[in-house]
């Protein structure tokens, strides 16, 4: 008897602040969403609108660096977290990502934020993403596409509402502003349960 693979919900954050051989920032986000949806064992179910945010470096906002376009994708995956993370790194490489500087500018950045609520900390992967709770550029588009979303706390003490985390992040660092970016939907799946959120609802 064939065993059915169990799908778990996953949250993936996308960002780009440099054009590349495959297009400008917006086009790179679109190509990344297409590539994620094409992965074996993965199906995208929803995507936020695109937002624009200032470049965040290790010592804070860098107003001299190109701004980022960011979005969040919801998907269902029948892979292990490690396999999915490896596949995301493969997409980054295919789209011209070169890992030279921590927190440096990049053509594409794909972060695995949450994987079915799992908590994991190994040399290879940390779930949930250890800095997602404080990043408005992740929380704002995530709240847009999934208003009732919760993020498990890494210390195992429960979960926090993404909407509440976003308010706290904006209060701590108002300079990390999130601005809607006018663009066509990153993903539509008419009749299959996929949705695309209106970028005008991001704040």
Residue ranges of model-derived segments:
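Nucleotide and nucleotide-moiety/phosphate-recognizing core
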Residues: 2-12, 18-107, 116-117
């Amino acid at each position: 008897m064939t065993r059915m693979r169990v799908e778990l919900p996953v949250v993936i954050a996308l960002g780009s602040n440099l054009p590349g051989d495959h297009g400008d920032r917006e086009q790179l986000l679109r190509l990344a969403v297409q590539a994620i949806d094409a992965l074996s064992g993965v199906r995208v179910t929803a995507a936020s609108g695109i937002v624009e945010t200032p470049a965040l470096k290790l010592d804070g906002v860098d107003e001299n660096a190109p701004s980022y376009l960011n979005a969040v994708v919801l998907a269902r995956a029948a892979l292990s977290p490690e396999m999915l993370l490896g596949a995301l790194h493969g997409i980054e490489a295919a789209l011209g990502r070169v890992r030279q500087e921590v927190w440096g500018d990049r053509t594409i950045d794909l972060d695995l934020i949450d994987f079915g609520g799992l908590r994991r900390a190994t040399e290879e992967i940390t779930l949930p993403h250890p800095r997602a709770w404080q990043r408005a550029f992740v929380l704002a588009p995530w709240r847009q596409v999934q208003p009732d979303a919760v993020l498990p706390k890494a210390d195992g003490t429960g979960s926090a509402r993404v909407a509440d985390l976003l308010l706290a992040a904006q209060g701590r660092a108002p300079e990390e502003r999130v601005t809607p970016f006018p663009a066509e939907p990153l993903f539509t799946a008419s009749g299959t349960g996929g949705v695309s959120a209106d970028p005008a609802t991001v704040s």
